[in-house]
From Swiss-Prot:
Transmembrane segments: none annotated. GO terms for biological process: L-tryptophan biosynthetic process. This is N-(5'-phosphoribosyl)anthranilate isomerase. Pathway: Amino-acid biosynthesis; L-tryptophan biosynthesis; L-tryptophan from chorismate: step 3/5. The keyword Isomerase applies. InterPro entries: Aldolase_TIM, PRAI_dom, RibuloseP-bd_barrel, TrpF_fam. It comes from Clostridium kluyveri (strain ATCC 8527 / DSM 555 / NBRC 12016 / NCIMB 10680 / K1). The gene is trpF. Keywords: Amino-acid biosynthesis, Aromatic amino acid biosynthesis, Isomerase, Tryptophan biosynthesis. The keyword Lipoprotein does not apply. One of its GO terms (molecular function) is phosphoribosylanthranilate isomerase activity. Pfam families: PRAI. It catalyses: N-(5-phospho-beta-D-ribosyl)anthranilate = 1-(2-carboxyphenylamino)-1-deoxy-D-ribulose 5-phosphate. HAMAP family: PRAI.
Amino acid sequence: MIKVKICGLKRDEDIKCVNRYKPDYVGFVFSKSKRQVNLEQAKMLIANLDSSIKSVGVFVDEALEYVYNTSKILALDVIQFHGLEDEEYMRHFNEFTIWKALKVRCREDILNLNYKYADGIVLDNKTAGSGKCFDWDIARHIKIKKDLILAGGINEENVETAAYIVNPDIVDVSSGVESQGYKDSSKIKMFIEKVRNIK
């Protein structure tokens, strides 16, 4: 079964919503973004998060010590690196589950991956959180020895097609479950139901 990550939670209402509809993962963005949260905000949100839902911290080219301390304080389940973090950087986080984002341009980008310290690879377009897809055919039925997380422009209307083409382990949605810049409870409900019904 394909798992679901809802990314970019900021408000108490967002937590109440995901606690009700139970995605597998939720993401908290610590890099500069309209969805950015700070440590104190994240601490309060995670404190109210259902224990069955795993927390993911999203970081972009942050200082190593900041990422490590934030991840320890919040007891994050997953650290997602979305910048230019290399193997030397990622090896300092081997006590955590690590996802590394790849801005997909061609199939070789995926096949030539050699992220020793990453447990999962996030396939995204060049501009994360933009709501735009990359060409999924590039990743058609690709096989890697890590969790494959598909992001970038996914929503309730196209997630079935995306799942059929790429066959990911996890789908990662942010703007695809928003209305006017905020997480939309009905869209989250419909998205999760749609993914749970994919055969």
